[in-house]
């Protein structure tokens, strides 16, 4: 059966997350239902596999999944057909590509990239409601960057993972954690860019929630290092809400899509 990789974008707001769940809407089940109209295997209950299982309310601009289909589709026609059957769900197939049988969206990936959007202003968000986390107070960019520097590299991230995390080890290597600032009407937007081979459950939201406390002046930057060294979930700052989080890309040794960056 030919295997296809799918590059996927979605608004996570109406979904209970990526993973299929009984009687709850998910991105996975939405795409599988669309595939079921095109492929007998999916009509009979076949499943797709994704690079990352995003939580409820988390968005994606560069999720990757793979599917084994009965028919050897032209990739462009496959993406067009899927987008037709996905309407009106806020899910889009940006590209499809024929890949080798040993390609696996999750296990072949060597990096994952996330963006978190944090907006500091008092007036409510309108256009970006549900697409960024908003706080009403000013934030200190330099302090947040100083706190973030303690988290780069290979560490035991027990403090920054959910108590329900199923990963075998809390040790991860955080390859990138940068923060940019931009002016918006009557406020500032802070964009956190994170990159690693893989992440623990709630790791990104735990990191951003902690750094927000640093930016607000509630934590000194050095307390981030102390929290990390504690290897204790109770030492973490608050876990920020999901709506500002985006899975923006997945890296592979051989990029499956011609315009992959």
UniProtKB/Swiss-Prot annotation:
GO biological process: tRNA pseudouridine synthesis
Reactions catalysed according to its record: uridine(38/39/40) in tRNA = pseudouridine(38/39/40) in tRNA
Record EC number: 5.4.99.12
Binding site for substrate: 114
Alphabetical list of Pfam families matching this protein: PseudoU_synth_1
InterPro entries according to UniProt: PsdUridine_synth_cat_dom_sf, PsdUridine_synth_TruA, PsdUridine_synth_TruA_a/b_dom, PsdUridine_synth_TruA_C, TruA/RsuA/RluB/E/F_N
Keyword Transferase (UniProt): no
Highest taxon in the source lineage: Bacteria
One GO MF term attached to the UniProt entry: RNA binding
Disulfide bonds listed in the record: none
Active site: 55 (nucleophile)
Key words, A-Z: Isomerase, tRNA processing
Subunit: Homodimer.
PANTHER family per UniProt: PSEUDOURIDYLATE SYNTHASE, TRNA PSEUDOURIDINE SYNTHASE-LIKE 1
NCBIfam families, per database record: hisT_truA
Main function: Formation of pseudouridine at positions 38, 39 and 40 in the anticodon stem and loop of transfer RNAs.
Similarity-based family: Belongs to the tRNA pseudouridine synthase TruA family.
Protein name per its UniProtKB record: tRNA pseudouridine synthase A
Species of the source: Paracoccus denitrificans (strain Pd 1222)
Taxonomic lineage from the root: Bacteria, Pseudomonadati, Pseudomonadota, Alphaproteobacteria, Rhodobacterales
Name of the gene: truA
